[in-house]
Design a protein with these regions (language model features):
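Cofactor-binding loop segments of dinucleotide-utilizing enzymes, especially the Rossmann-like FAD-
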Residues: 18, 87-89, 112
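Active-site donor-binding acidic/aromatic loop of nucleotide-activated sugar
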Residues: 43-47
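Short acidic active-site motifs
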Residues: 53
């Protein structure tokens, strides 16, 4: 059994990075994160965390911003009411939308266009105006 997340350490506002990913990288991830950072988000590379740390990270989170990745399976460890913002390429399935619905989480998504069509391994860039609009709607209401 994993102990509950307690004490200082992980931010309640989590930005999951794909900087170390071998494929489906977000070429302007630094620019995207720069828009979330002033809101108190901290960036995490899940591959740098032990399993128990990933569990604690998601247990503690109130908001999770993530590009589509297997790391979002950690949503099963979330606390009720967690807000999930998933960014994924238009050809990808948004399975984590279904998981979020099943877990009764707040869910929003942004679709991006891959740099190459018909490839599940291509990199992408995220239009910053979409991020700014989402932040305005969700965090500055």
């Amino acid at each position: 059994m994993v102990p509950a997340a307690t004490g200082p350490g992980f931010s309640k506002k989590v930005f999951v990075s794909r900087q170390k990913a071998a494929y489906r990288r977000v070429l302007n991830e630094d620019d995207v994160f720069a828009l979330f950072q002033p809101l108190g988000f901290k960036r995490y590379n899940l591959e740098d965390l032990k399993f128990v740390e990933q569990v604690r990270l998601f247990q503690n989170a109130e908001v999770v911003v993530s590009f589509n990745s297997a790391g979002l399976t950690n949503l099963i460890f979330r606390k009720p009411g967690t807000h999930v913002i998933e960014i994924f390429q238009e050809h990808e399935e948004n399975y984590f939308c279904y998981l979020s619905q099943t877990l009764h989480l707040k869910y929003d998504c942004l679709k991006t266009t891959p740099l190459k069509k018909n490839s599940g391994y291509t990199n992408t860039t995220v239009p910053l105006e979409l991020i700014k609009d989402l932040i305005k709607r969700k965090f500055h209401n």
